[in-house]
Amino acid sequence: MLDIKLIRENPDLVKGDLIKRGEIEKIKWIDEILELDKKWRENLRKINQLRKERNQLAVQIGKRKKAGEPIDDLLAKSNEIVKQIETLEKEVEELRAKIDYYLWRLPNITHESVPIGKDDSENVPIRFWGKAKVWEGFLETFKEQSLGKMDYEVIDWRPRLHVDMLEILRGADIERAAKVSGSRFYYLLNELVILDLALIRFALDKLIEKGFIPVIPPYMVRRYVEEGVTSFGDFEDVIYKVEGEDLYLIPTAEHPLAGMHANEILEGKDLPLLYVGISPCFRKEAGTAGKDTKGIFRVHQFHKVEQFVYSRPEESWEWHEKLIQNAEEIFQELEIPYRVVNICTGDLGYVAAKKYDIEAWMAGQGKFREVVSASNCTEWQARRLNIRYRDKTHEKPKFVHTLNSTAIATSRAIVAILENHQTEEGVVKLPKVLWKYTGFKEILPAHMKEKCCQGLE
């Protein structure tokens, strides 16, 4: 939520930012907010003046009572003032509700470094890491996507899609999951279960070493929390509601971690607060019909390790860079080639002032796909959830800044591992950093396991 003072003092800045975001229809809201705010403040002044007059009348009534003089005329005036105050207070309440309606639906102010663009096609790659395995048939599109700035190795065999790898490894059963739960669900099986858990523990250990407090949050939150952390459109497109309850299944651990300190005043000395949340995530994926319908890349349920920071405003941009760096280190140790993308205004969403994505090279698909998002939400969430801090007891509290970033979403990380670390024979060579968590170094196709077993008989 934006600060009403910002709109009062710099309406052109807010309008200009809406233009950058392509939210043209909301520009007129700013003038409407200013007009409503003017009436609201005028009414408050009138109420204060009337209260002053009522207090003066009370003094006069007291004096007349002592003197034994009639007070009927003064009581009539006082009662009339009370009625006027009640009318104005009702108007103030209605005006405030109208102002809040707009404020709660305005996006965050973007950082000056955010590129202007209409959609994800205009996001800007800013750096690349790793040596990509590129099938010769994908070479030209790879060079285009990597801007010629990424090292690569050309291979003459086409890596399998993760969907096909899941089948030959017997790593998932999507057909039976569809029977039980519908589309975009899956049973994870065999070594991939261990791999999923290994990825969680690897990311968790790394962040604990960096001073993050591990948290398993509630998997359901109340509506006021969801309203505080995300845009209203997400209630239709993303979030599952528990029928008959004021509870919603979390689409990310970011949401309960943001709500953790709702309506609190934090001690300045305790900032930054660093949390790493581990949770399942539940998403409707409405509006994505036809996209990634096969496999486990875009699903209704998955595990995720999430970084979350409450920081001082002056430190939040530094923390934004640290969060994306943490995520990059994770994917570097997993030996997954990737690019970091600065998300443009048209793809940014309402909550973030700036967002980076990490997009992993998917050797089977021949393109980069999102595996991490890291956002600085500045005070947009903190205002909605009333999360403030102060350094001294009698100091006026200030709003914190909130930041979040994926550390690892296991289903997408598994997709990246299956597509990048497979051999021509279909063996998956796991990155060394996971060996101590998995207890094995590679995953064999099912037919190879059968041969192994037959040889032992």
Swiss-Prot record:
It is found in: Cytoplasm. PROSITE patterns: AA_TRNA_LIGASE_II (PS50862). The keyword Protein biosynthesis applies. Keywords: Aminoacyl-tRNA synthetase, ATP-binding, Cytoplasm, Ligase, Nucleotide-binding, Protein biosynthesis. SUPFAM superfamilies: Class II aaRS and biotin synthetases, tRNA-binding arm. One of its GO terms (biological process) is seryl-tRNA aminoacylation. Belongs to the class-II aminoacyl-tRNA synthetase family. Type-1 seryl-tRNA synthetase subfamily. Homodimer. The tRNA molecule binds across the dimer. This is Serine--tRNA ligase. The lineage of its organism: Archaea, Methanobacteriati, Methanobacteriota, Thermococci, Thermococcales.
